[in-house]
């Protein structure tokens, strides 16, 4: 309880009290924080894992470490104020987040000093520090810095205090002079309800005055770390070079994260010189405070729990190399790192295009009455939406169709701003869409309103006037000025707290290029760097580069590719291309005594800044912009010395493409810098004249010149399917044979199954081939979306199924207008289009004059309007020529001109008709002669064919008879066997016949199966050639044609596929020596995808491909390094098995036994000379028919094209007047007739029809009555 007693814990609850005794006169002073960046070793600022630290392992962990790049300089020694008193800081409270790292000075005085000055350390964690959960750590000698004896201190006390409900004084601190006595106020820490559950104190020895502390909140505990005592001089150098790791100290239960921290200060009392504090007035101490961040680290521990070494995996290439290899001492070599990464380099915002629209400030401050509300239109400009949203004291904001947050971040086609005042009742009704006098007679919103209603407070006591008559439409206003004056004069005063200003913001969705965009903090365009961008509302991540080849349409700001991706933007009349960021793998060349060399694989140095993310650390950022970078075939190399004239034949750090990192000079690691690696050329057989072949040297021919050749290759892929009637084939028509065949069981069924198997093999093989030949297609449906003012109709032409359809006037129009149709030689339709599509109508008659074969023509039809026009012109010109001295007679010229042109039109039409009539007559007569001749020749040919066909029919009859005799012979032979043999002997002979035929049939079916298997194999070969030769370029020589394959074209052929292979074949060769491998300096080398050759008259080995002789230097890219120069030979034995010879047999005995009692006499009456193979010769007739057809084709009449010209003439006005008068008169007559006859009249009981000849005497019922027998009884 020592700490609580010393601090004077009180049970009073109040705001934060003062920390020092009232007798201390201290002047408050503002507390200023500064920031700096300190380079520190990772091992000095990381917080080790307390559970693994004593394992002595090297492993990769996610641990917390101090972010020294943004170190806070926290002053804790306010200056003295001379004899009038001291100063005290209003110390800052800083956020804690995950935790804090602190480096502090405890003391400055050596043991021999008699100044007795001190700078104790103290920190308090909490939130509000009033009735709050608080944790305090203090490092101060004796009694919280109040010395009990005047002597230098070599020990300090550690005070730990945790309270769940306490209040800490406002600016905690210590006195700078130790022997000052008690200076802390009694209520510096107030404990409410004895809530302090941790209160520990212990002592530690003091070695130096500087120490590092770290505080980490984790799982409801406060973990405390500390370093050893640090040297007081050259603080930053010791942090970056020395080894001062932190170790875990202890854990305090605090019940959760405490979000804020306040550090204690060291003050100088008033009248310091008189009281001994004057010896401590010149000290100026700052705490170095850094926040903790979680990083991916590689950490190596000692067995005592301290950190031996550590590396931040994202800090630099060297640090990441340690993490990749898992070692702090990897062997020399080139190692792949992760992909080029971290954060985006910057942000580009461009939103403003037009001029600036000035907001109506004065109207918003003093809005008009609702009856005379004010409207402002915003179009093609930049507008500050915050003026009407954020800058006004909002009472209520409600938006429709748009989020209030996005209102000031989007562009719109136009913005309408209506401003007025409104009272509370009308405002609620407007928001709830309740009709009242405001919405009915003053201002009404449309049903599809898109925008925001912003009601804001007014500081005004002006009267409030609304109209209550004359309804308005949405967006409309009162138009009667006298009524408006009356309303305004009758305005009544309302308390200003019940009247609000109303801004109605109506938005139109963005369309086109003239937009209203919000004011934003536009940035400078960052080029050739990976950035996030917001370009006129279009957001994304990419690289902006100036591009003069992109074309952006007029009035537009973007251009897109064929796939719809935005690829260009116009900013301030400059065109920029938008390209995606790149991501590339990075490699590092490592040597322990040299700086790390970086290789950006496959990336040019100008594109390093285009990586997806700009690196976090300073070292990675420097690598992305370093000037000492070199473009190589392998990529961009950074941080090396270029030696492109140096060639080495051994390389420990190859980077590909015959390039290598080497340590070109003897380097010694020092504390300041390391030499750089050198980039040189790598040739493993450089100066290989001493290289020896590993195998015998052979002479080979390598092509040097080629020619293109075409090869045809046919592959049969299918065969005809065969069906066999097994029983008929074996026995014919013999019933005795069929009986014997029954003893063979399922032989015929097996034969049919085998044939079915053949068909299945052929079908499956053909199906697989068809699948390989087939090409999958799909319909590409493009959906066009037309928004805004874009109109693509002119580009796309006619769309839909009715394109090109002729339109006609309706039947009603045919009834109302007269039509005249005449023949059009080709100029009348164009004349009518000229009249209809331009201004002026009939006045443009002569302007629309057409030309036909060099002659000016006009249609011969003149409408009444045109006739009246020319007549009045002619009459006026003639009549006025007398008193105008003949000048107006020029008006006759248009009349005469149009008359001549119309006569030309009649003449042209007549001439074309005459020419067409001559062509028709001549061609028709020619056609009749040729048709008659053709029919004659056809008749002769048919007669000849009839004679030949009749002869063939007779011969066919003879053939059928002879075939019948032949088939009967088979049955006769079998029947003869049965007639000579009896019983078993006969059946045995038949059995031998059946066996023989079965063997033949089995052999045939086997051949069919073999043929089907061959077809299947051919199908597989064809499919392989389609896949390798047609769909790709084969690398196999002579597989797709003869030579090196270029292109193959497949064609379907009968029962197969025909390939046309194009390949280039050698015509000339180089005769050179080659070896399978070379040995140089005890290392073996083999060629990779080629061969080593020794050109004639040289002693230097080279490399060339086998397809083309092009010797180049041997390099790492075309060479495989072997483990040794020895060759392993393997001998393969093979044995050829000779087929065994079958045993001999006496064929004559078998033959004699079979034909022992068999008669072989057969009456063959077949005579092939009985057939007359006559042929039909109709060549002459066919040739004649061809000539006739050609003559008929020549008789085609090429008529002059005559269109039908249709002219619609409207009736004169007097005809329409007479027609309307007639219709009106007819209607009046019908009505009059109906009224006079009272027959079906609508004036009498609503169409109460009666007989026209009936009685008409009736009376109106004035009173209620009952009618009986046509009499009325009241």
From Swiss-Prot:
Positions of the UniProt region annotated as Heptad repeat 2: 1162-1201
Coiled-coil ranges per UniProt: 946-990, 1174-1202
Keywords assigned by UniProt, alphabetized: Coiled coil, Disulfide bond, Fusion of virus membrane with host endosomal membrane, Fusion of virus membrane with host membrane, Glycoprotein, Host cell membrane, Host membrane, Host-virus interaction, Lipoprotein, Membrane, Palmitate, Signal, Transmembrane, Transmembrane helix, Viral attachment to host cell, Viral envelope protein, Viral penetration into host cytoplasm, Virion, Virulence, Virus entry into host cell
Claim: Membrane is one of the keywords in the record: yes
Sequence ranges assigned to domain BetaCoV S1-CTD in this UniProt record: 355-519
Topology within the bilayer: Single-pass type I membrane protein
Topology Cytoplasmic: residue spans: 1234-1274
Family, similarity comment: Belongs to the betacoronaviruses spike protein family.
The name this protein goes by in its record: Spike glycoprotein
């Amino acid at each position: 309880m020592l700490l609580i007693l010393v601090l004077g814990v009180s049970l009073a609850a109040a705001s934060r009290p003062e920390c020092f005794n009232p007798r201390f006169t201290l002047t408050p002073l503002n507390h200023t924080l500064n920031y700096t960046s300190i380079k520190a070793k990772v091992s000095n600022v990381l917080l080790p894992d307390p559970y693994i630290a004593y394992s002595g392992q090297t492993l990769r962990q996610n641990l917390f470490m101090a972010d020294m790049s943004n170190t806070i300089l926290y002053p804790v020694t306010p200056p003295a104020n001379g004899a009038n008193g001291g100063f005290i800081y209003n110390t800052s409270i800083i956020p804690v987040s995950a935790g804090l790292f602190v480096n502090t000075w405890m003391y400055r005085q050596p043991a021999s000093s008699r100044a007795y000055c001190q700078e104790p350390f103290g920190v308090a964690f909490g939130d509000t520090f009033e009735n709050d959960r608080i944790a305090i750590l203090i490092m101060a000698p004796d009694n919280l810095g109040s010395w009990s004896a005047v002597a230098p201190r070599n020990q300090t006390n550690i005070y730990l205090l945790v309270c769940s409900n306490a209040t800490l004084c406002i600016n905690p601190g210590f006195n700078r002079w130790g022997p000052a006595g008690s200076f802390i106020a009694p209520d510096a820490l107030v404990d409410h309800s004895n809530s302090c559950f941790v209160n520990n104190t212990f002592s530690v020895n003091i070695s130096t005055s500087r120490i590092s502390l770290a505080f980490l909140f984790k799982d409801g505990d406060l973990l405390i770390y500390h370093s050893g005592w640090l040297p007081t001089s050259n603080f930053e150098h010791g942090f970056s070079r020395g080894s001062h790791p932190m170790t875990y100290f202890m854990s305090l239960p605090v019940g959760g994260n405490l979000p804020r921290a306040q550090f204690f200060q060291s003050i100088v009392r008033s009248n310091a010189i008189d009281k001994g504090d004057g010896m401590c007035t010149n000290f100026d101490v700052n705490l170095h405070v850094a926040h903790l961040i979680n990083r991916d680290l590689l950490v190596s521990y000692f067995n005592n729990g301290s950190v031996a070494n550590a590396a931040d995996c994202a800090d630099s290439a060297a640090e990441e190399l340690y993490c990749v290899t898992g070692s702090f001492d990897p062997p020399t070599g080139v190692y792949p790192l992760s992909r080029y990464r971290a954060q985006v380099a910057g942000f580009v915002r461009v939103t403003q295009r037009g001029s600036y629209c000035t907001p109506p400030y004065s109207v918003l401050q003093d809005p008009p009455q609702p009856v005379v509300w004010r409207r402002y239109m915003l179009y093609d400009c930049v507008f500050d939406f915050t003026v009407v949203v954020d800058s006004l004291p909002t009472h209520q904001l409600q938006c429709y169709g748009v989020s209030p947050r996005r209102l000031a971040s989007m562009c719109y086609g136009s913005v309408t701003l209506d401003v007025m005042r409104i009272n509370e009742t009308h405002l609620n009704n407007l928001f709830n869409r309740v009709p009242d006098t405001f919405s009915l007679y003053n201002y009404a919103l449309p049903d599809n309103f898109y925008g925001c209603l912003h009601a804001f407070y007014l500081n005004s006591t002006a009267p409030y006037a609304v109209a209550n008559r004359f309804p308005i439409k949405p967006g409309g206003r009162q138009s009667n000025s006298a009524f408006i004056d009356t309303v305004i004069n009758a305005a009544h005063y309302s308390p200003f707290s019940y009247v609000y200003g109303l801004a109605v913001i109506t938005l139109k969705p963005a369309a086109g290029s003239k937009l209203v965009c919000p004011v934003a903090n536009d940035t400078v365009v960052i080029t050739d760097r990976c950035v996030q961008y917001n370009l006129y509302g279009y957001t994304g991540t990419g690289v902006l580069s100036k591009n003069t080849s992109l074309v952006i349409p007029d009035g537009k700001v973007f251009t897109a590719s064929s796939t719809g991706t935005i690829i260009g933007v116009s900013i301030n009349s400059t065109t920029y291309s938008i390209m995606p960021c790149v991501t590339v793998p990075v490699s590092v060349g490592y040597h322990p005594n040299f700086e790390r060399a970086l290789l950006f694989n496959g990336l040019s140095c100008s594109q390093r800044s285009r990586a997806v993310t700009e690196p976090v650390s300073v070292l990675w950022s420097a690598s992305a912009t370093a000037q000492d970078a070199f473009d190589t075939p392998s990529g961009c190399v950074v941080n090396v010395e270029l030696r492109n004239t140096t060639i080495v034949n051994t390389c420990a750090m190859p980077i590909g493409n015959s390039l290598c990192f080497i340590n070109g000079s003897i380097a010694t690691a020092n504390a300041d810098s390391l030499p750089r690696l050198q980039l040189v050329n790598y040739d493993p057989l450089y100066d290989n004249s001493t290289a020896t072949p590993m195998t015998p040297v052979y002479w080979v021919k390598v092509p040097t010149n080629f020619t293109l050749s075409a090869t045809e290759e046919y592959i049969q892929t299918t065969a005809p399917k065969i069906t066999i009637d097994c029983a008929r084939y074996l026995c014919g028509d013999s019933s005795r044979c069929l009986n014997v065949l029954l003893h063979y069981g399922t032989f015929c069924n097996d034969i049919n199954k085998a044939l079915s198997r053949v068909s299945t093999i052929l079908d499956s093989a053909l199906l697989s081939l068809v699948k390989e030949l087939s090409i999958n297609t799909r319909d590409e449906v493009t959906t066009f979306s037309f928004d805004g003012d874009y109109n693509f109709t002119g580009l796309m032409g006619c769309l839909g199924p009715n394109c090109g359809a002729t339109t006609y006037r309706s039947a009603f129009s045919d009834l109302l207008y007269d039509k005249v149709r005449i023949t059009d030689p080709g100029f009348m339709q164009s004349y009518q289009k000229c009249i209809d599509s331009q201004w002026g109508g009939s006045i443009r008659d002569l302007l629309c004059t057409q030309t036909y074969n060099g002659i000016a023509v006009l249609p011969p039809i003149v409408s009444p309007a045109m006739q009246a026009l020319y007549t009045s012109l002619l009459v006026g010109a003639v009549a006025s020529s007398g008193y105008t001295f003949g000048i107006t007679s020029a008006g006759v010229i248009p009349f005469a001109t149009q008359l001549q042109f119309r006569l030309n039109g009649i003449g042209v039409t007549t001439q074309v008709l005459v020419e067409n009539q001559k062509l028709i007559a001549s061609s028709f007569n020619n056609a009749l002669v040729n048709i008659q001749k053709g029919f004659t020749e056809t008749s002769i040919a048919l007669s000849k064919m009839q004679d030949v066909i009749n002869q063939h029919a007779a011969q066919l009859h003879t053939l059928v008879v002879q075939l019948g005799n032949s088939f009967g012979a088979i049955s006769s032979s079998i029947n003869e066997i049965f007639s000579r043999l009896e019983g078993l002997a006969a059946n045995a002979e038949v059995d031998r016949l059946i066996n023989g035929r079965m063997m033949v049939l089995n052999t045939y079916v086997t051949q069919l199966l073999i043929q089907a298997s061959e077809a299947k194999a051919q199908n597989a070969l064809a499919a392989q050639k389609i896949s390798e030769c047609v769909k790709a370029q084969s690398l196999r020589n002579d597989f797709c044609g003869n030579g090196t394959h270029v292109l193959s074209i497949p064609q379907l052929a009968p029962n197969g596929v025909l390939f046309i292979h194009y390949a280039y074949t050698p015509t000339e060769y180089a005769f050179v020596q080659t070896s399978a491998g070379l040995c140089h300096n005890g290392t073996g080398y083999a060629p990779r995808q080629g061969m080593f050759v020794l050109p004639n008259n040289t002693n230097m080995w080279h490399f060339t491909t086998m397809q083309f002789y092009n010797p180049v230097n041997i390099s790492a890219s075309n060479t495989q390094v072997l483990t040794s120069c020895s060759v392993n030979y393997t001998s393969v034995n093979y044995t050829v098995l000779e087929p065994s010879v079958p045993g001999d047999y006496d064929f004559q005995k078998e033959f004699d036994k079979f034909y022992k009692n068999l008669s072989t006499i057969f009456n063959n009456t077949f005579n092939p000379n009985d057939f007359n193979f006559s042929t039909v010769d109709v060549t002459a007739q066919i040739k004649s028919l061809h000539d006739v057809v050609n003559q008929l084709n020549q008789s085609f009449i090429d008529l002059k094209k005559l269109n039908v010209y249709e002219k619609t003439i409207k009736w004169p006005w007097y005809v329409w007047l007479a027609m309307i008068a007639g219709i009106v008169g007819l209607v009046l007559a019908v009505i009059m007739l109906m009224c006079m006859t009272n027959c079906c009249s609508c004036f009498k009981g609503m169409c109460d029809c009666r007989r026209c000849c009936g009685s008409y005497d009736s009376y109106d019922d004035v009173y209620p009555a009952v009618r009986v027998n046509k009499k009325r009884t009241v």
